[in-house]
Amino acid sequence: MYFFSIITDLSLTNLTKIHYLCKRIPETEGKMNIIEAKFAGSCTRASQKPSRRLPEFAFIGRSNVGKSSLINMLCGNSKLAKTSSTPGKTKLINHFIINDSWYLVDLPGYGFAKVSKEGREELRKMINDYILRSGEMVILFVLIDSRHDITKIDREFLANLGENGIPFSIIFTKGDKLGPNALKAQIERDREILSEEWEEMPPMFASSAVTGAGKEEILDYIQQYINL
């Protein structure tokens, strides 16, 4: 099954509720501080990724969700991942080695803004190949724009992950665009929408690349998996 297309073969209306299959880990002590973040390489297929095998934590979202800005905020480097006012700028799978112990993986966005039909197909295959064949991927962080209700394409994407047993967590981006109460209400609204398809919710984080909100929680969550 392909995960992402403008039209998917997974019907949300006929879908039996999905059980979240990601292994729940016990909370452990440990804080993560990113001391060093370096670009390690780009590829178009999982077989071409860096040869050094380390845990991988991948980030993906619809075009213009603020993925590059979030990655830069997490790493404390405003120039690590290239940001652009043009949606869909990331066209390769980019690996960054963090603290010489794990990879942060920047995946192309789905939604394919301003991309040709052939380009959409190539990006779809590239994303599928990485998610299905990267044996080192620990968690896929799916980024959702907190300013709006979760979209149909986001829901279909998450449902496909669930049906295929892909471990993931959700990060709500651009939290600074809403007040605290409005942000909380919007996340609860999205929880209600997702509860139509999910028996239980995956881990969720609220974030802002502008204020740094969510940085500590997301990095400490990653650290818990590295500690296993």
Residue ranges and their predicted role:
Residues 6, 17-23:
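Short, positively charged and aromatic/hydrophobic N-terminal segments
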Residues 129-200:
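Conserved C-terminal guanine-recognition region of P-loop GTPase G domains, centered on the G4
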Residues 44, 89, 102, 109-112, ...:
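Conserved nucleotide-binding/hydrolysis micro-motifs of P-loop NTPases
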Residues 30-107, 112:
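Conserved G1/Walker A P-loop phosphate-binding module
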Residues 34-43, 178-228:
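Canonical P-loop GTPase G-domain recognition
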Residues 90-93, 108-135, 147-159:
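Switch II of P-loop NTPase G domains
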